[in-house]
C-alpha cells in the first residue's frame, strides 16, 4: 500500500511540474512586453524627395541604397506613403504593410521608379515576462513541497496504523480450542444462585461439542470413502 502511495505522489509531482512549466511558457509568449521606439519624423510631414535623375545617374544610387545592411534586432512594420507629391492619391492611401529594413531613405527599383517609404514605423520588442515565470515557479515549488510533506506524514503514520490494527486483530481459531472466557468476580450468593444454570449450560455445551465432533468425523470418513 505504501509503494502505491509513493508512486501516485510521484506521478502527481511530475504532472504539477509539467503543467506549471508549460503554463509559464505559454503565458510568457501570449503576454509579451511591447516597447515602442518613437521616430523623429513620425509627427512631421515627409520631406520631399528629389525627382529621380537620369537612369545613368540613378543606377549607382540604387545600388548604394539597395546594398545589404545589418539586420535590426526588432521587426519594424509601417504603412507605405509615397513621397512624391505628383503621384496619384490612390497610391498614397494604400494600406499594404512594408518592412523598414534600415534608415528611411528613398529607394529606387531597377527601372528608376521610386519605392514607397514608411513614414511612421513602430518597433515591437518581444520579451519574456520574468515576473510571471517567477510567480508560477514559486507556486509549483509550494505545491510540490506540500505534497512531499504530506507524503512523509503518511509514511510516518502508516506504521502506527498497522501496529494498532495488528493489536486489535484476533485470529479466529477453532471453536473447540477456544478457552472459555474468565467470568468476572461476583459475590458468593450470585455464584450459588447461578451454579445450577451454569452447570446445565456447560453440560449442553459439552453435549453439543461432542455432537459436532461426531458429525465432523462422519463427514471426513465419508469423504475419504468417496475418494
UniProtKB/Swiss-Prot annotation:
Keywords of this entry: Membrane, Transmembrane, Transmembrane helix
List the InterPro entries hit by this protein, alphabetically. TMEM9/TMEM9B (IPR008853)
Provide the protein's localization.
Membrane
Q: Which residues form the signal peptide?
A: none
**Which residue windows are transmembrane per the record?**
7-24, 135-157
* One annotated Gene Ontology cellular component of this protein: lysosomal membrane
Per the record, membrane topology reads:
Multi-pass membrane protein
Can you tell me which family this protein belongs to? Belongs to the TMEM9 family.
Q: Name one Pfam family in it.
A: Tmemb_9
Species the sequence originates in: Drosophila melanogaster (Fruit fly)
Q: What is this protein called?
A: Uncharacterized protein CG1161
Amino acid at each position: 500500500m505504501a509503494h502505491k502511495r509513493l508512486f501516485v505522489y510521484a506521478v502527481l509531482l511530475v504532472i504539477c511540474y509539467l503543467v506549471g512549466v508549460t503554463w509559464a511558457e505559454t503565458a510568457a509568449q501570449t503576454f509579451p512586453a511591447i516597447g515602442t521606439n518613437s521616430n523623429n519624423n513620425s509627427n512631421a510631414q515627409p520631406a520631399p524627395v528629389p525627382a529621380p535623375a537620369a537612369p545613368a545617374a540613378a543606377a549607382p544610387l540604387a545600388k548604394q541604397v539597395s546594398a545589404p545592411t545589418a539586420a535590426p534586432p526588432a521587426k519594424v512594420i509601417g504603412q507605405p506613403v509615397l513621397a512624391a507629391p505628383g503621384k496619384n492619391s490612390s497610391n498614397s492611401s494604400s494600406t499594404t504593410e512594408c518592412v523598414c529594413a534600415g534608415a528611411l531613405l528613398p529607394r529606387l527599383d531597377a527601372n528608376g521608379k521610386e519605392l514607397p517609404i514608411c513614414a511612421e514605423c513602430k518597433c515591437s520588442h518581444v520579451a519574456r515576462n520574468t515576473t510571471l515565470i517567477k510567480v508560477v515557479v514559486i507556486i509549483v515549488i509550494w505545491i510540490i513541497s506540500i505534497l512531499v510533506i504530506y507524503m512523509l506524514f503518511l509514511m510516518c503514520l502508516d506504521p502506527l496504523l498497522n501496529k494498532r490494527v495488528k493489536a486489535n486483530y484476533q485470529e479466529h481459531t477453532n471453536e473447540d480450542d477456544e478457552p472459555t472466557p474468565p467470568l468476572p468476580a461476583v459475590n458468593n450468593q450470585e455464584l450459588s444462585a447461578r451454579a445450577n444454570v451454569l452447570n446445565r449450560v456447560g453440560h449442553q455445551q459439552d453435549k453439543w461439542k461432542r455432537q459436532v465432533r461426531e458429525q465432523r468425523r462422519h463427514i471426513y470418513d465419508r469423504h475419504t470413502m468417496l475418494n
